[in-house]
Amino acid sequence: MFAVLKTGGKQYKVQAGDVLRVEKLACEAGDKIQFNDILMVGGDSVTVGAPFVAGAAVQAEVIAQIKGEKTIHYVKRRRKHSSQRTKGHRQQLTLLRVTDVLASGADASGVAVATGTADARRAAHNASAKE
């Protein structure tokens, strides 16, 4: 059975046992997380969501928090200025192993829902604003 999930603004086609590199999630290595934004579930029959499949989920285990490959941005300005600048960037990523694809029954699984770091910051900000 496979599923198409959405996280970090991207879509991934996964099945049990797959290892994924996704945008950084607010969790620690060894945590079990669940993705509820499932766009499609397939197997014997295919179910396409509008926009999400109700009750479907993908459960995964966090292997590690890693950094992506370094990208280097080099800027050289035009004549008579002799100015150069080099900037590097390494994207923060989360390494996951998919443990299970659930076509239904995701609400009763008891596994924590995966949230990105931006979602976690937004929730903390909203909680402090209410106090």
Curated annotation (Swiss-Prot):
| BP GO annotations | translation
UniProt-recorded Gene Ontology molecular function terms: rRNA binding; structural constituent of ribosome
Q: Which GO terms describe its cellular component?
A: cytoplasm; ribonucleoprotein complex; ribosome
- What domain of life does the native source organism fall in? Bacteria
**Keyword rRNA-binding found:** yes
Asked if the keyword DNA damage belongs to this entry, the reply reads no
List the keywords (alphabetical): Ribonucleoprotein, Ribosomal protein, RNA-binding, rRNA-binding
Q: Name one Pfam family in it.
A: Ribosomal_L21p
Assembly with partners or alone = Part of the 50S ribosomal subunit. Contacts protein L20.
Function, in words: This protein binds to 23S rRNA in the presence of protein L20.
Recorded hits in NCBIfam families, A to Z, give: L21 (TIGR00061)
- Family per UniProt? Belongs to the bacterial ribosomal protein bL21 family.
Return the protein name: Large ribosomal subunit protein bL21
In which organism is this protein found? Answer: Cereibacter sphaeroides (strain ATCC 17023 / DSM 158 / JCM 6121 / CCUG 31486 / LMG 2827 / NBRC 12203 / NCIMB 8253 / ATH 2.4.1.)
